[in-house]
């Protein structure tokens, strides 16, 4: 915990003094089709494979992209909670974040153009305990973590997005 707090303080101090260093391009994620609806997503770390359910033509051999979205939110929120607890000097004894969503697949399949393709709703459940913290302290940690979670921010804020098409 102390090493996390020290690293956060060092990075925060540096970016306070050098705000021009705070903006950078994120690593590229590239999805390459393997077969059918199965894709290998490549980046700077281990590749990830996705697939779709058999009901829509996939082989159900790997997580769906929608599940990876929920996994990204769960991992990001959990990471930020751990960082905020470390910043406060609170040793967590348990931290678990689960993310559920509801979707209407008419949107993905184009059956009804009025139905959104993305989740209709998302529920985040956080189980958090610490021997040396009150419930109010833990709630404050979660509130700060949620306000600083990049994945959560990308989901709730309208982020400018462009698409470039190459057909060669």
Locations of regions flagged by a protein language model:
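Extended beta-strand/beta-hairpin segments
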Residues: 1-71, 81-168
């Amino acid at each position: 915990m102390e090493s996390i707090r020290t690293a956060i303080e060092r990075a925060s101090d540096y970016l306070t003094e050098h705000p021009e260093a705070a903006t950078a391009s994120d690593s590229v994620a590239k999805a390459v089709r393997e077969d059918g609806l199965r894709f290998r997503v490549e980046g700077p770390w281990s590749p990830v494979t996705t697939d779709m359910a058999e009901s829509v033509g996939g082989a159900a051999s790997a997580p769906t992209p929608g599940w990876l979205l929920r996994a990204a939110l769960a991992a990001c929120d959990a990471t930020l909670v751990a960082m905020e607890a470390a910043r406060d000097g609170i040793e967590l004894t348990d931290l678990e974040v689960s993310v559920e969503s509801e979707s209407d697949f008419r949107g993905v399949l184009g059956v009804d153009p009025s139905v959104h393709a993305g989740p209709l709703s998302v529920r985040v459940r956080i189980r958090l305990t610490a021997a040396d913290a009150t419930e109010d302290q833990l709630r404050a940690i979660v509130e700060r973590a949620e306000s600083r979670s990049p994945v959560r921010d990308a989901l709730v804020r309208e982020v400018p997005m462009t698409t470039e098409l190459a057909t060669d």
